């Protein structure tokens, strides 16, 4: 299976070609460092980059995440590094040794209770990584930073509360007059790349991302699958869990996801965060009956984000 087809159908679900012993190259032209390898994008990178027909590939891949390596990620042909990048000492100890890195893919983030805290924590995480790798990787050529559409819409706490630019949103629009950890990360990136001549960069700003990761804070597809499973288990109709505005508006996403079979019930203004209250036992029954990996409802459902996307005042819906 090729890298582009894997991406087109969802790399996480594809059965990808794995390296055989005699296929593994002795040296790699491209060496990727994926920060946040257990997230949706990081998990896909861990599958796609090592393929032989991936541009620049096959890549050697270092995958970094805070938690121990999960079983659903264990078959990816990468070198997994458990590292807390919010800890400068842990980051320097483990990442400064990666002297062969040519590309950094920074696809990690964490959520705090305020945007000021988001700026502080996420900025420190990125800075720790760059300061550990840039001085020690002589062949480092490019840094890819993933942020998102909140660059144009504002932080979660300000969605729908601040004046936005008129659409369409383009990369050269001035920043909004509000605190935003994406802006802070970009400033740190620009500051750090000046320390190495010839180092290039790119910033990617996707909107909703469809993919696989049980660890993602924003796994919309996974949450909807859990919602659908609970509806089926209880014999209830599968209604679209959002507003009419969210149903009708156009929205950019990185994979296709058909919702044609959903029904919209006029006047039912209940978000998934409310609907899923008290469903912990139902999910336990489903896990037992279907012999699924033991998880709690809280672990597999991100209801606040689903409500944000489909119902709870998302700024995107004002442009339907």
Where is each model-derived feature located?
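NAD(P)-dependent short-chain dehydrogenase/reductase
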Residues: 195-248
């Amino acid at each position: 299976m090729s890298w582009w087809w894997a991406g087109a159908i969802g790399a996480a679900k594809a059965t990808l070609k794995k390296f055989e012993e005699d296929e593994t190259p002795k040296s790699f032209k491209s060496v990727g460092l994926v920060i946040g390898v257990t997230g949706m994008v990081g998990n896909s990178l861990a599958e796609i980059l090592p393929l032989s027909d991936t541009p620049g590939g096959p890549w050697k891949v270092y995958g970094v995440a805070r938690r121990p390596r999960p079983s659903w990620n264990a078959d990816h042909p990468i070198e997994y590094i458990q590292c807390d990048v919010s800890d400068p000492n842990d980051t320097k100890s483990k990442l400064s040794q990666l002297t062969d890195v040519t590309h950094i893919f920074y696809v990690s983030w964490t959520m705090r209770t305020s945007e000021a805290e988001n700026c502080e924590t996420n900025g420190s995480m990125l800075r720790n990584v760059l300061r550990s790798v840039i001085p020690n990787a002589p062949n480092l050529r490019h840094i890819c930073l993933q942020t998102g559409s909140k660059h144009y819409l504002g932080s979660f706490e300000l969605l729908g509360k601040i004046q936005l630019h008129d659409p369409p949103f383009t990369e050269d629009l001035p920043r909004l007059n509000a605190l935003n950890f994406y802006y802070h990360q970009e400033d740190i990136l620009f500051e750090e790349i000046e320390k190495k001549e010839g180092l290039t960069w790119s910033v990617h700003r996707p909107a909703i991302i469809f993919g696989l990761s049980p660890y993602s804070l924003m796994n919309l597809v996974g949450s909807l699958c859990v919602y659908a499973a609970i509806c089926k288990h209880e014999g209830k109709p599968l209604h679209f869990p959002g507003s009419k505005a969210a149903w009708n508006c156009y929205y950019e996403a990185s994979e296709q996801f058909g919702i044609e079979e959903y029904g919209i019930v006029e006047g039912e203004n209940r978000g998934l965060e409310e609907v899923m209250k008290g469903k912990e036992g139902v999910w336990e029954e489903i896990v037992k009956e279907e012999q699924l990996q033991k998880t709690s409802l809280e672990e597999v459902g991100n209801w606040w984000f689903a409500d944000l996307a489909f119902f709870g005042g998302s700024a995107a819906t004002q442009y339907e």
